[in-house]
UniProtKB/Swiss-Prot annotation:
PANTHER family: GLUTAMYL-TRNA(GLN) AMIDOTRANSFERASE SUBUNIT A, TRANSAMIDASE. This is Glutamyl-tRNA(Gln) amidotransferase subunit A. Heterotrimer of A, B and C subunits. SUPFAM superfamilies: Amidase signature (AS) enzymes (SSF75304). InterPro entries: Amidase (IPR000120), Amidase_CS (IPR020556), Amidase_dom (IPR023631), AS_sf (IPR036928), GatA (IPR004412). One of its GO terms (biological process) is translation. The gene is gatA. GO terms for cellular component: glutamyl-tRNA(Gln) amidotransferase complex. It catalyses: L-glutamyl-tRNA(Gln) + L-glutamine + ATP + H2O = L-glutaminyl-tRNA(Gln) + L-glutamate + ADP + phosphate + H(+). Allows the formation of correctly charged Gln-tRNA(Gln) through the transamidation of misacylated Glu-tRNA(Gln) in organisms which lack glutaminyl-tRNA synthetase. The reaction takes place in the presence of glutamine and ATP through an activated gamma-phospho-Glu-tRNA(Gln). It is an enzyme of class 6 (ligase). GO terms for molecular function: ATP binding; glutaminyl-tRNA synthase (glutamine-hydrolyzing) activity.
């Protein structure tokens, strides 16, 4: 039995039945990482000794017949912008190279409390800015389905770790699609929860009104399991909602009779690959066969979402990244004349091109004379987009669309074409701007590459997403796909 190919719920079953030890599971994954990660590039840091130590502790509890917790013995990878005490937290940037976190993020605390085994920190686009993980300062992450293609981004390492069987579960962050798009490209399940459903405390900020931690897994049940473990109120993050977290496992049923699904025409227009369109339309038919009522709908303001997103997120990034100045921690230039020179050279040398591009854009739209014309207007557009979604959700339980207009593109294909790269998030960005939840799951294969189906629902209706996603998933076999790597 290849333990690395099993889902989290399958591992939980054999662990609780004492068919396998937690240490055996952990060593299987560490061996897998040592075997393949030099080609896949999922990990920036592996915590081998600590992982084995935790596994042995769990085995001791099992021997005493103590009750297992939600994630007991399950290997988890953490994106390298989410703090884990004692591990590096570089955000895949030269400016934070060598930085070790002195504390745990709230989501990390919750994973540890539920006895998940953290294997290490995962590769990403620098400061979560990118759609291909080509912006990492340290190494490329590659798609397990085709090593010449990108895994998506910015949570590319998180997707690769799960798809490449280097972790059972992983955490990413999603600001404009950074969990859903790599989940689509790598053929796994990824959730962007409602803004405020999961704490951002201890997550390095990119766009503070957009950032959300998102769980990733091999199937919908795994994703629901991890969401249940990490969701809920956190007093350290005032944006988290004081709303009870439902038992998402109860939503995992094929019964979706009477559920109303809208198909927005704006997500099926120009730029959508015809083969992707066909795969998504076939998935919609399956949902209809399972009892859902499917009707067309319209979200006319979606064309403005991408522009609003890049103005708002870049403005917030320019403010958030001002703290990285070469003084208290992180990279400091060795050649400087005075304090101002330290700031200038440390940031110029420490940040990559995409990060500098977004800082400049953000500083520009916040500057005198342009604030009203760009930033203030983008906030107004954001409000209108939220209203657009609320109007549609009065008539529908969910909206269905492609996750990305294409399958995974080749490494280097869009690296120097900024607009083309930004457009790869055209179907995920509107959801982030509105703050509503969405899930991506595999719905087909095109020329050996996975296609992603995106299901979107109203605020705090993750249970609806899990219900619809599970119903579709269990009606097809795409969730059983494993990259032959």
């Amino acid at each position: 039995m290849d333990l690395t190919k099993l889902t989290a719920h399958e591992l939980k079953d054999i662990l609780s039945n004492k068919e396998v030890k937690a240490e055996e599971i952990t060593r299987a994954f560490l061996d897998r990482i040592n075997l393949v990660d030099n080609k896949l590039g999922a990990y920036l840091y592996v915590s081998e000794e600590e992982a084995i130590k935790k596994a042995k502790e769990i085995d001791g509890k099992i021997e005493k017949n103590e009750e297992l917790k939600a994630l007991s013995g399950i290997p988890v990878g953490i994106k390298d912008n989410i703090n884990v005490k004692g591990m590096q937290n570089t955000c895949a940037s030269k400016i934070l190279q060598g930085y070790t976190s002195p504390y745990d993020a709230h989501v990390t605390e919750k994973i540890k409390k539920e006895e998940g085994i953290i294997l290490g920190k995962l590769n990403m686009d620098e400061f979560a800015m990118g759609s291909s993980t080509e912006n990492s300062a340290f190494k490329l992450a590659k798609n397990p389905w085709d090593l010449e293609r990108v895994p998506g981004g910015s949570s590319g390492g998180s997707a690769v770790a799960v798809a490449g069987c280097e972790a059972t579960l992983s955490l990413g962050t999603d600001t404009g699609g950074s969990v859903r798009q790599p989940a689509s490209f790598c053929g796994i399940v990824g959730l962007k929860p409602t803004y405020g459903r999961i704490s951002r405390s201890g997550v390095v900020a990119f766009g503070s009104t957009l950032d959300q931690v998102g769980p990733m897994g091999k199937d919908v049940e795994d994703c629901a399991l991890l969401t249940s473990a990490i969701a809920g109120l956190d007093k350290k993050d005032f944006t988290t909602a004081d709303k009870e977290v439902p038992d998402y496992k109860k939503s995992l049923t094929k019964d979706i009779k009477g559920k109303k699904i809208g198909i927005p025409k704006e997500f099926f227009g120009e730029g959508l690959d015809e083969k992707v369109r066909k795969s998504v339309e076939e998935a919609i038919k399956v949902l209809e066969e399972n009892g859902a009522e499917v009707k067309p709908c319209s979200l006319p303001l979606m064309d403005y979402a991408l522009s609003a997103y890049y103005i708002i997120s870049s403005a917030e990034a320019s403010s958030n990244l001002a703290r990285f100045d070469g003084i208290r921690y992180g990279y400091r230039s060795k050649n400087f004349k005075d304090a101002q020179d330290i700031y200038l050279k440390s940031r110029s040398e420490g940040f990559g091109d995409e990060v500098k591009r977004r800082i400049m854009l953000g500083t520009y739209v916040l500057s005198a004379g342009y604030y009203d014309a760009y930033y203030k207007k983008a906030l107004k557009v954001r409000k209108l987009i939220k209203d657009d979604f609320q109007r549609v959700f009065k008539d529908f339980d969910a909206i269905v669309s492609p996750t990305s207009p294409t399958t995974a593109f080749k490494v280097g294909e869009k690296k120097d074409d900024v607009m083309s790269m930004y457009l790869s998030d055209i179907y995920t960005v509107p959801i982030s701007v509105a703050g509503v939840p969405a899930i991506s799951l595999p719905c087909g294969m095109i020329d050996g590459l996975p296609v992603g189906l995106q299901i979107i629902s109203d605020y705090f209706k993750e249970n609806v997403l899990f219900n619809l996603a599970y119903s579709y998933e269990q009606s097809v076999d795409f969730y059983k796909m494993r990259a032959d790597f």
